[in-house]
């Protein structure tokens, strides 16, 4: 297991439910951090799906995506800009040459995620920011700006009450699809307001408090402290990538391995380590064995 190389005070966490089985089915939604964790688990032999609308950062858009799983999308949900058709509710990976193609891809993704959610062994949701972009002509919060000129948007921060309601409602939607599925909430450790760290702190505080309340209100719901591990346990710029915003590869491994160790049976860690060994060998990365 990857360990912190410097002295530290550990963030304590005990998963309050039965450990999740290896080779199970996951459903995940949220930021690039959720995407990274889920893809690593899928590469380790788990089944499942992450982000039916592509990467989403704020709880309002995450809740909206889950609400739309049943009713789906139409060509009217797409708009044309710069020669492509985009959806305000989707990541740019869903942009298409025409609205029919975009709507078809969005609906197929929603259908696949519904199927996955109904049989998932656990659900992971990662919120990253309470800061959102409001599209002024339509007065709506957007999940992605799609490089539309900035003068069409207003930046605002969701209130605590809005964050709380969105996260709790998202959990209730998951519970309706799969009543026994454990829900694991996390706050992404990625700095989402790089130009204003005080705004980033306020944003993360609202998300953290809202996640805590959801865990107290929604059955079978727990919080995994990814944010705290990076900011309070590792708490050093050596654990950030070159952009000083995202966790470094070492930090991601530390957080992921803590997640596996805390929430899963031991075989899940063994599967991950075997997959990581294969990955390093395929890229000809030297294998460094720990000293005895």
Regions found by a protein language model. Give the residues of each.
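Extracellular glycan-modifying ectodomains
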Residues: 1-292
């Amino acid at each position: 297991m990857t360990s912190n190389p410097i002295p530290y005070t550990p963030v304590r966490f005990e998963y309050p439910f039965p450990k999740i089985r290896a080779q199970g089915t996951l459903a995940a939604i949220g930021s690039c951090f959720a995407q990274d964790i889920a893809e690593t688990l899928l590469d380790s032999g788990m089944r499942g799906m992450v982000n039916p609308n592509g990467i989403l950062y704020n709880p309002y858009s995450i809740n909206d995506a889950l609400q739309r799983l049943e009713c789906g999308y139409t060509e009217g949900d797409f708009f044309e800009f710069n020669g492509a058709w985009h959806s305000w509710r989707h990541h740019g990976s869903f942009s298409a040459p025409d609205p029919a193609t975009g709507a078809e891809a969005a609906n197929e993704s929603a259908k696949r995620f519904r199927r996955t959610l109904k049989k998932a062994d656990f659900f992971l949701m990662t919120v990253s920011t309470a800061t959102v972009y409001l599209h002024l002509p339509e007065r709506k919060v957007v999940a992605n700006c799609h490089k539309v000129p900035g003068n069409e948007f207003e930046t605002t921060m969701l209130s605590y009450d809005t964050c709380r309601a969105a996260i709790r409602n998202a959990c209730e939607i998951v519970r309706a699809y799969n009543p026994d599925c454990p829900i694991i909430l996390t706050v992404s450790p990625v700095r989402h307001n790089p130009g204003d760290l005080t705004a980033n702190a306020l944003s993360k505080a609202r998300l953290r408090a809202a996640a805590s309340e959801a865990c107290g209100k929604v059955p079978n719901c727990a919080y995994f402290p990814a944010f705290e591990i990076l900011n309070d346990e590792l708490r050093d710029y050596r654990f950030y990538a070159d952009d000083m915003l995202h966790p470094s590869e070492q930090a991601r491994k530390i957080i992921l391995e803590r997640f596996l160790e805390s929430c899963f049976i031991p075989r899940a860690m063994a599967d991950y380590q075997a997959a990581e060994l294969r990955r390093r060998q395929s890229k000809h990365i030297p294998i460094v064995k720990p000293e005895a």
